[in-house]
């Protein structure tokens, strides 16, 4: 996927701003990463080998946090004994394409997708091109909002889509010195029951 230097600088700046805001957890697509979205029933424009028909993304941001809850107030109140995990949401940016009217329709109709909806992070330009090292799989997914703009400053219109889901599964696959995949590390969370999967 071709990305010019001006886009690289904007991505770096965007990441710095997000970190400054102190989000609980964030992940943003970098210049050395190709980022793809696989959404059941939606055909994207990607022609990248292994990701034909996927949706190519410009950036991805995820937040999660855990808010401590104090048992009481006043002089005798002890330290927080409970907490409230918040799954947060996923915000993606993509170029306007044939999938744009579909996402707009899903936002306005409030349609929920059972899933799985999968975000794939793949290393680009390495000795093993497009090697997947991180995936985020969602179930019971709904696009909550969509905003279109020319924020990249060129002739391309982009759109920012906020996605919410009931279940998240995060999987990181390390790369061995030989270039092959290592043992995947996964964590899943159910946002409805607030329990690990």
Language model regions located:
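N-terminal secretory signal peptides that target proteins for export/translocation
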Residues: 1-10
